[in-house]
């Protein structure tokens, strides 16, 4: 059970956050992010790709949509280009967006202004409205093209976050490593939490 740091019973006032789950390996990162945000009382809008559904089935043996329905009533396929998140007014009234995991294809589309689906279009809206956008990249190694795309977005204020777990937390299991990545992504949106053990020197 995750609780907001510094509180016992108070849940954070409900705010809207968009979570994108692309077809990169590491679907569990997206699911865990949604779980934590749900516990913190956020209104969560989730955009998923067809590839993400396949990856979830392969890596976790689950139906991704059925799993996400436990935590949110707002689930969109990236082909639903007409859905509410495609409007820039939606991003203006949202706290932020995290694409976790973010595939290299999705990174490239966003970096080059290609809003061919709901996921990339929504991300572009967050950039043009100067709202917080976090891209959690899991791919390795990264070549010059991927790094240039990431640099282009970083210069625009987008947070580029590699899914690189820390070992100073002395993880006891894979959940500790997953929670560290998710917690770091939430940090970038300014969300208070106690999901992982912070470095104290």
From Swiss-Prot:
Keywords: Flavoprotein, FMN, Prenyltransferase, Transferase. It catalyses: dimethylallyl phosphate + FMNH2 = prenylated FMNH2 + phosphate. It holds the Pfam family Flavoprotein. It is an enzyme of class 2 (transferase). The keyword Iron-sulfur does not apply. FMN binds at residues 23-25, 49, 103-106, 138. GO terms for molecular function: carboxy-lyase activity; flavin prenyltransferase activity. Dimethylallyl phosphate binds at residues 168, 184. The keyword Flavoprotein applies. Its EC number is 2.5.1.129. Flavin prenyltransferase that catalyzes the synthesis of the prenylated FMN cofactor (prenyl-FMN) for 4-hydroxy-3-polyprenylbenzoic acid decarboxylase UbiD. The prenyltransferase is metal-independent and links a dimethylallyl moiety from dimethylallyl monophosphate (DMAP) to the flavin N5 and C6 atoms of FMN. Belongs to the UbiX/PAD1 family. HAMAP family: ubiX_pad. This is Flavin prenyltransferase UbiX.
């Amino acid at each position: 059970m995750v609780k907001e740091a510094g509180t016992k019973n108070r849940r954070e006032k409900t705010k809207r956050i968009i979570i994108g789950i692309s077809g990169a390996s590491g679907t569990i990162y997206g699911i865990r992010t949604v779980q934590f945000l749900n516990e913190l009382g956020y209104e969560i809008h989730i955009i998923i790709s067809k590839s993400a559904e396949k990856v979830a089935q392969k890596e976790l043996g689950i139906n991704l949509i059925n799993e996400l329905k436990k935590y949110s009533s707002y689930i969109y396929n990236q082909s639903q280009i007409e859905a509410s998140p495609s409007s820039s007014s939606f991003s203006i009234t949202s706290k932020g967006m995290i694409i976790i995991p973010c595939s290299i294809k999705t990174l490239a589309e966003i970096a080059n202004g290609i809003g061919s689906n709901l996921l990339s279009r929504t991300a572009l809206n967050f950039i043009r409205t100067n709202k917080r956008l976090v891209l959690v990249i899991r791919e390795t190694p990264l070549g010059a093209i991927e790094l240039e795309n990431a640099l282009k977005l970083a210069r625009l204020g987008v947070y580029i976050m590699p899914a690189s777990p820390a070992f100073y937390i002395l993880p006891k299991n894979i959940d500790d490593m997953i929670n560290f990545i998710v917690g770091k992504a939430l940090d970038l949106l300014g969300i208070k939490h106690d999901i992982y053990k912070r470095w104290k020197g």
